[in-house]
Amino acid sequence: MTNKIIQMLEAEQMNKEIPTFAPGDTVVVQVKVKEGDRQRLQAFEGVVIAKRNRGLNSAFTVRKISSGVGVERTFQTYSPLVDSLSVKRRGDVRKAKLYYLRDLSGKAARIKEKLS
């Protein structure tokens, strides 16, 4: 059981508006990237294959195929490096963790779109 003071401090830091998303959804994550003295936004678009809800320590993993190679990236939900998160498409899946997508390729790795 966490301390009440820790809960209060974490609640203060969780002030970011995060849209509702689930595994199977296609999301676009805008990430702040620092190159030398410049800072820019980089978009990372892919399918959410895992989500971890732990308050301030929440995280999610996004997978995409980049020039034939699978790329996975785990983001801390409330990280200051994550600028924005938008849901492009809702996926209809039955599992909470979609790690089986790592072994699939091509059309087999597609996810059905959720209707409604």
Swiss-Prot record:
GO terms for biological process: translation. One of its GO terms (molecular function) is structural constituent of ribosome. InterPro entries: Ribosomal_bL19 (IPR001857), Ribosomal_bL19_CS (IPR018257), Ribosomal_bL19_sf (IPR038657), Translation_prot_SH3-like_sf (IPR008991). The keyword Ribonucleoprotein applies. The keyword Ribonucleoprotein applies. HAMAP family: Ribosomal_bL19. This protein is located at the 30S-50S ribosomal subunit interface and may play a role in the structure and function of the aminoacyl-tRNA binding site. This is Large ribosomal subunit protein bL19. It comes from Ectopseudomonas mendocina (strain ymp).
